[in-house]
């Protein structure tokens, strides 16, 4: 490994140690608890607290394939069955089902680690066998700054001391979508490009060849009203100033000609939907071809949304959650508003969802068509049974493992693979 890359890896390992120290006291411990407040009323029956399924899940076994990742975030399968795994500290590694675990792939852009921001998703181009392209989302340091960790106490302190104007222009880093070619020996990224700025959560390839990327609200850490007035924010302001949105681009970074806001010059043309808070999970429903997005609420109010082009999903004026101090959202506590879309399902208290999966495999025929959600705060794999676009049953699996589950994927053989925050890659297969 060249000297410069050795230094970079060493610096990122040092950042790991610094981040662990920075987050040793959970932020949640300083907040109110959703359980201390009455739950919100759903807009329709079955929108929350679905009953257990009539049939419990079949017996399955859980195997630990690897247990040495450093805060993994995402998993993507290569055509040969190997995997790419992203780690929050700026690494992408190759892994395999036999426990192989590579050194970090060289050439990954510098990453800044700030609260929830870091290296996030990694995705394989649908034509990878021909072009070897991969995509990834990450948080880059601002121009002139070195990569590394911004400790939480410093970050939150800087935010709260800032004025309204300063918060709107505060640049703690650059949210980016990157694309690169994976070298033939799988040791380096080549021809690294920045496809898009402003979003950096989940990547999903659409059936029409375009790609969706989800982005979080840049003000989510200090909640509306972030200026202390606790008031509603107008839709034009949300579209101009907030990054809580789903974007749609072509795989080369160009803008599809049928995107919904192309005729509005004040709106970024890649915008597909808006009013999102922190959508860390997204997947295409294989039955309908629609994009489903799972997003974090504030204090309670995590949501499952079906995305409509041009749709407003309510944040920061509408939510089934509360501000972190327990106050109503936007001063009203509204859970519905004319012109905004309702989630098809929500959780209260929150589960802290991340990766999602529509199961289509043959190993678990009982699970076919079910939606699986990686629950971090819930420390469970959550199974949702669907009837069309409605959730009719919910089951929580693996709670006995007491693991923050970060991502869930289906393997080529139909097994289910999970990443946990403490560095494990787990595999679920039927118990015989």
Residue ranges of predicted features:
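Beta-propeller domains
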Residues: 84-106
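Blade-loop segments of beta-propeller domains
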Residues: 101-124
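Blade-level signature of beta-propeller repeat domains, shared across WD40, Kelch, NHL, RCC1
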Residues: 407-432
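Beta-propeller domain segments
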Residues: 31-56, 117-119, 127-129, 140-167, ...
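Beta-strand-rich domains and repeat architectures in extracellular enzymes and scaffolds
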Residues: 64-90, 352-358
């Amino acid at each position: 490994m060249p000297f410069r890359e050795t230094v970079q890896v060493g610096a990122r390992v040092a950042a790991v140690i610094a981040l662990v120290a920075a987050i040793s006291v959970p932020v949640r411990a300083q907040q109110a608890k959703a359980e201390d407040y009455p739950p919100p009323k759903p807009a329709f029956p079955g929108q929350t607290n679905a009953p257990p399924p009539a049939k419990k899940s079949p017996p399955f076994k859980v195997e630990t394939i690897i247990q040495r990742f450093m805060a993994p975030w995402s998993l993507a399968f290569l055509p040969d069955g190997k995997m790419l795994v992203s780690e929050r500290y700026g690494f992408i590694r190759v892994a395999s089902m036999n426990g192989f675990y590579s050194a970090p792939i060289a050439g990954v852009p510098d990453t800044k680690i700030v609260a929830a921001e870091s290296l996030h998703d990694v995705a394989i181009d649908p034509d990878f066998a021909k072009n070897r392209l991969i995509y990834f989302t990450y948080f880059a340091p601002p121009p002139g700054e070195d990569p590394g960790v911004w400790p939480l106490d410093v970050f939150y302190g800087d935010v709260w001391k800032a004025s309204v104007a300063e918060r709107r222009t505060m640049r703690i880093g650059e949210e980016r979508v990157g694309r690169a070619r994976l070298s033939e020996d799988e040791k380096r990224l080549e021809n690294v490009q920045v496809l898009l700025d402003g979003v950096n959560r989940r990547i999903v390839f659409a059936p029409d060849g375009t790609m969706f990327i989800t982005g979080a609200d840049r003000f989510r850490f200090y909640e509306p009203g972030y200026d202390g007035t606790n008031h509603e924010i107008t839709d034009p302001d949300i579209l101009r100033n907030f990054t809580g949105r789903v974007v749609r681009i072509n795989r080369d970074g160009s803008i599809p000609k049928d995107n919904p806001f192309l005729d509005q010059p004040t709106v970024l043309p890649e915008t597909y939907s808006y009013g999102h808070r922190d959508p860390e999970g997204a997947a295409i429903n294989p039955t309908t071809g629609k994009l489903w997005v799972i997003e974090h609420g504030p204090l309670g109010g995590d949501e499952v949304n079906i995305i409509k082009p041009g749709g407003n999903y309510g944040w920061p004026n509408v939510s089934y959650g509360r501000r972190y101090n327990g106050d109503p959202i936007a001063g009203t506590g509204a859970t519905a508003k004319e012109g905004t879309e309702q989630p098809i399902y929500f959780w209260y208290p929150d589960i802290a969802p991340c990766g999602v999966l529509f199961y289509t495999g043959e190993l678990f025929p009982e699970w076919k068509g079910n939606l699986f959600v990686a629950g971090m705060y819930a420390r469970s794999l959550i199974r949702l049974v669907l009837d069309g676009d409605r959730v009719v049953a919910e089951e929580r699996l693996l709670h006995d493992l007491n693991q923050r589950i970060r991502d869930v994927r289906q393997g080529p053989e139909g097994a289910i693979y999970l990443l946990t925050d403490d560095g494990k890659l787990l595999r679920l297969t039927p118990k015989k």
